[in-house]
């Protein structure tokens, strides 16, 4: 569902989609997305994957155990590193609204940074960390988020159970 929705918007030039990851390599993510798109008969719509890459020995597929950042950039290791990457992407974007979808604790800074931060899935660890920081009030169900004014929405994280809910939420925009 999300792939079809995104493909339509990318084709109409109303959406650019990126992935920023601390845990997975760019090659792994790109290959998984390509296989998924082929399996579902849709175009791969992610504009670019920003993730660390495993360093291999020259002329070999053998990994050295080191990682390097995307392109010539610093490695992405923490939530603040993800925010720096998102800020760099947004500064070059033709779009004026940033939406960030995440599910882990390293996503918290980006969920709070984005114009629209969407916590997908149960997000138990994210919820626990926000609770420990006394920030429970930033989390909203989709229904309660809809009742907020624009400034309050931008200072909030909206919780979506799955990609269907994310798709429905984004169609409101």
Where are these regions (language model features)?
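C-terminal cap/substrate-recognition subdomain and adjoining C-terminal extension
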Residues: 1-173
């Amino acid at each position: 569902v999300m792939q079809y929705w995104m493909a339509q918007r990318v084709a109409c030039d109303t959406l650019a989609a990126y992935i920023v990851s601390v845990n997975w390599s760019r090659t792994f993510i790109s290959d998984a997305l390509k296989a998924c798109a082929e399996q579902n008969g849709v175009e791969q719509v992610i504009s670019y994957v920003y993730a660390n890459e495993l360093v291999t020995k020259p002329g070999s597929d053998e990994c050295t155990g080191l990682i390097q950042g995307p392109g010539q950039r610093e490695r992405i290791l923490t939530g603040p590193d993800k925010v720096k990457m998102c800020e760099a992407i947004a500064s070059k974007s033709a779009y004026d609204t940033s939406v960030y979808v995440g599910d882990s604790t390293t996503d918290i800074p980006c969920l709070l940074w984005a114009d629209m931060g969407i916590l997908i899935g149960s997000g138990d660890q994210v919820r626990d960390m926000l609770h420990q920081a006394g920030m429970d009030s930033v989390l909203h169900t989709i229904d309660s988020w809809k009742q907020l004014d624009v400034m309050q929405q931008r200072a909030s994280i909206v919780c979506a159970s799955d990609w269907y809910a994310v798709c429905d939420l984004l169609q409101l925009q």
